[in-house]
Swiss-Prot record:
InterPro entries: Bac_surfAg_D15 (IPR000184), BamA/TamA_POTRA (IPR010827), D15-like (IPR039910), OM_assembly_BamA (IPR023707), POTRA (IPR034746). The keyword Repeat applies. Part of the outer membrane protein assembly complex, which is involved in assembly and insertion of beta-barrel proteins into the outer membrane. Constitutes, with BamD, the core component of the assembly machinery. NCBIfam families: OM_YaeT, PRK11067.1. Residues 24-91, 92-172, 175-263, 266-344, 347-421 form the POTRA domain. The gene is bamA. Gene3D superfamilies: membrane protein fhac, membrane protein fhac: a member of the omp85/tpsb transporter family. The keyword Membrane applies. It is found in: Cell outer membrane. Its main location: membrane. One of its GO terms (biological process) is protein insertion into membrane. This is Outer membrane protein assembly factor BamA. It comes from the Bacteria.
Length: 805
């Protein structure tokens, strides 16, 4: 065998034997060391072929080409006569990737970053890439204040040139801010300035926003906050000269020093507008009428620029440019604003498209649009469409994207990107309660039936005191103009005594239909007719009930527990809704007012009217709408007509998960006062009167309920599920009273309270958790009553399916 001659030893050290200008002719090419890489693939990557005449430069190019494939750790090229011998050492293949000690960074995020760098199972391992990854991860930990963190890649060899890759993390602890110093401030104290920061050197227990853990990004945000603080107060020459971040020797403490130059306060001397105003100069100038002599404010300048862009957007100018150049006069300490506007091109809307509506039909979304295809683009109309889609309650999120049409100077497509939520619920349950006994419940509710926008519900309940079934359907677009049509049929067999209410049994059935007429974007009127048949029996004589029977001329015995009667009522139902909520479920901003009423019409056995008013207002505290104040009220009033009274089975009740939490359902308000004295089993035997009080709720013809809530971010819930879970702390108050109650001497002697007094208000406070689960909305609450009266029953923990607020 001829002596082999070493041409190239490694990538880093290049030494080759010089064969002269003519080189030699390659008769054959052999490889040594190939395992995973095929010979054909290696040959294709080489610039040298059999029959080529090669020299030193060709050999160097060959080695570079083989290294460039990323498959080899080492490459040697030798000559054996006229044969080119290529010796390679393949990079090992990654058999598995594991992580240890990482708490701040999740495994999924690490895998994504590794794959972006080409490090994945089945690929060859590049050790230089690992070094970059180690350094990048350590830099990340440093940016969040963990300066003692380290990341090491442990490579374990396996048979067949494979390796296990393990990233071992030692995260350490976050460095805490020991002190923040601001140098150069004279107009404002350091404490005053630091109070606007997220980073703090001292954080009181009640401050859930402040943080002593150092983070580079938060510091950058705080410096911008500091800059805005001064610019908004007239300091047009304010400057942050330098920022020093010092680390204690143990890497657990941080000292931050910010050096600033405040400068003087400047006042506005005027505003000058120029440029392409697209014929809207008067409207634009009205937006720039800042008062000369007022302090210069960066926030007002930004608001002015946004207002001009929004105005032009309404007229179809989708991409206007507005630039404000402050002209500072240091002599008289004034600033003149020179506003340059370029409206740009005016755009038509070519198409409106929807993405993400896998269930909802395109037509269901399109009918909510106020922007039309083929018309001038109007940003306000596009936003109105987004608002209407949000209020449907079908979607978790709705985003808009205005996209230019390729090759067209004046056309755009408007794209609505939605993320659908589960708008239906199915529940089947078997339970046992001290009041209800064995309980069966089944229900199906779908607010977007088969993607058509129809709302369909089938519900049923069976327990010791109630058998209830209902079918309802609503078409929100019965006509193309948005007139809705809804209907309902129901059957209810209700034993009030077993439900801890006044003693009677009512078997009822009925139906109703309602038309809804949109008045404008936010107001809807409703009108409809209803029929209900009530068959009452087993009525134990009690004062409020007998008062009603007397008013309708119905004779009843005070000595019998088996009184009964039947009534057929026809009602005219009406209502009004004002809705400016930002979303159909879990709103964070806006208000909703809902007024409902009904009155009997001629042909009815009863004559009465009934009104309920529900209000809800949401006030976001922060820009992200994660902290929200919610105020709710519910008012109700009803009475008889023509000298008659409101039927007792139409009374209002309060207490329970949807009114005053912490109290048993329907337990707040007047209680039944029975005739017959102490012979009744459910009487409170406190006197020898002919009547006796009880703890059985009977309700009243008037009701008032109010609630104040603080909605907060839910702990331990990732952003992915933040839109599906809501936590709140609440204070509830409410009362029910009877305006027709007469607190006679007989009642006082029996120890009966004055049920006509509306001031007997119950109160409670607690915490609630709402979850939009796959089965429908689930609501859990824990409340403690702190103002209650005799006969009230507490129920601290409550659970409800199918209602959110």
């Amino acid at each position: 065998m001829a002596m082999k001659k070493l041409l190239i030893a490694s990538l880093l050290f290049s030494s080759a034997t010089v064969y002269g200008a003519e080189g030699f002719v390659v008769k054959d090419i052999h490889f040594e060391g190939l395992q995973r890489v095929a010979v054909g693939a290696a040959l294709l990557s080489m610039p040298v072929r059999q029959g080529d005449t090669v020299n030193d430069e060709d050999i160097s190019n060959t080695i570079r080409a083989l290294f460039a494939t990323g498959n080899f750790e080492d490459v040697r090229v030798l000559r054996d006569g006229d044969t080119l011998l290529v010796q390679v050492k393949e990079r090992p293949t990654i058999a598995s990737i594991t992580f240890s000690g990482n708490k701040s960074v999740k495994d999924d995020m690490l895998k994504q970053n590794l794959e972006a760098s080409g490090v994945r199972v089945g690929e060859s391992l590049d050790r230089t890439t690992l070094s970059d990854i180690e350094k990048g991860l350590e830099d990340f930990y440093y940016s969040v204040g963990k300066y003692s963190a380290s990341v090491k890649a442990v490579v374990t060899p396996l048979p067949r040139n494979r390796v296990d890759l393990k990233l071992v993390f030692q995260e350490g602890v976050s460095a805490k801010i020991q002190q923040i110093n601001i140098v150069g401030n004279h107009a404002f104290t350091t404490d005053e300035l630091i109070s606007t920061f997220q980073l703090r050197d001292e954080v009181p227990w009640w401050n859930v926003v402040g943080d002593r853990k150092y983070q580079k990004q938060k510091l950058a945000g705080d410096l911008e906050t500091l800059r805005s603080y001064y610019l908004d107060r007239g300091y047009a020459r304010f400057n942050i000269d330098s920022t020093q971040v010092s680390l204690t020797p143990d890497k657990k403490g941080i000292y931050i020093t910010v050096n600033i130059t405040e400068g003087d306060q400047y006042k506005l001397s005027g505003v000058e507008v120029s440029g392409n105003l697209a014929g809207h100069s008067a409207e634009i100038e009205s937006l720039t009428k800042l008062q000369p002599g007022e302090l210069y404010s960066g926030a007002k300048v930004t608001k002015m620029e946004d207002g001009i862009k929004k105005l032009l957007g309404r007229y179809g100018y989708a991409y206007p440019r507005v630039q404000t150049q402050p002209e500072i006069n240091d002599t008289d300490k004034t600033v003149k604003l020179r506003v340059n506007v370029d409206a740009g091109n005016r755009f038509y809307v070519r198409k409106i498209r929807f993405e993400g509506n896998d269930t909802s039909k395109d037509s269901v979304l399109r009918r909510e649009m106020r922007q039309m295809e083929g018309a001038w683009l109007g940003s306000d109309l596009v936003d109105q469409g987004k608002e209407r889609l949000n209020r449907l309650g079908y979607f978790e999120t709705v985003d808009t994207d205005t996209q230019r049409v390729a090759g067209s100077p004046d056309q755009v497509d408007v794209v609505y990107k939605v993320k659908e939520r589960n708008t239906g619920s199915f529940n089947f349950g078997v339970g046992y309660g001290t009041e209800s006994g064995v309980s069966f419940q089944v229900g199906v509710q779908q607010d977007n039936w088969l993607g058509t926008g129809y709302s369909v519900g089938i519900n049923g309940t069976k327990n010791d005191y109630q058998t209830y079934s209902e079918f309802s359907v609503t078409n929100p677009y019965f006509t193309v103009d948005g007139v809705s049509l809804g209907g309902r049929i129901f059957y209810n067999d209700f034993k009030a005594d077993d439900a801890d209410l006044s003693s009677y049994t009512n078997k009822s059935y009925g139906l109703d239909g309602t038309l809804g007429f949109p008045i404008n974007e936010y107001n809807t009127l409703r009108a409809g007719l209803g029929y209900v048949h009530n068959d009452l029996s087993n009525m134990q004589p009690q004062v409020a009930m007998w008062r009603y029977l007397d008013s309708i001329g119905q004779a009843a015995s005070k000595s019998s527990d088996n009184n009964g009667f039947a009534a057929d009522d026809f009602t005219f139902n009406y209502g009004w809704t004002y809705n400016r909520l930002d979303r159909g479920f879990f709103p964070t901003e806006g208000s909703r007012v809902n007024l409902n009423g009904k009155v009997t019409v001629p042909g009815s056995d009863n004559e009465f009217y009934k009104l309920t008013l529900d209000t809800a207002s949401y006030f976001p505290i922060d820009d992200d709408h994660k902290w929200v104040v919610l105020g709710r009220t519910r008012w109700g009033y009803g009475d008889g007509l023509g000298g008659k009274e409101l039927p007792f089975y139409e009374n209002f009740y309060a207490g329970g998960s949807s009114t005053v939490r912490g109290f048993q359902s329907n337990n707040i308000g007047p209680k039944a006062v029975y005739y017959g004295g102490n012979d009744k089993d459910n009487c409170n035997k406190t006197s020898s009167s002919e009547v006796c009080s009880s703890d059985d709720a009977v309700g009243g013809n008037a009701m008032g309920v109010a609630s104040l809530e603080i909605i907060t971010p839910t702990p331990f819930i990732s952003d992915k599920y933040a839109n599906s879970v809501r936590t709140s702390f609440f204070w509830d108050a409410g009362t029910v009273w009877d305006t027709n109650w007469e607190n006679t001497a007989q009642m006082k002697a029996a120890g009966v309270p004055d049920y006509s007094d509306p001031s007997n208000i119950r109160m409670s406070a607690g915490i609630a958790l709402q979850w939009m689960s796959p089965l429908g909305p689930l609501v859990f609450s824990y409340a403690q009553p702190f103002k209650k009266y005799d006969g009230d029953k507490a129920e601290q923990f409550q659970f409800n399916i199918g209602k959110t607020w």
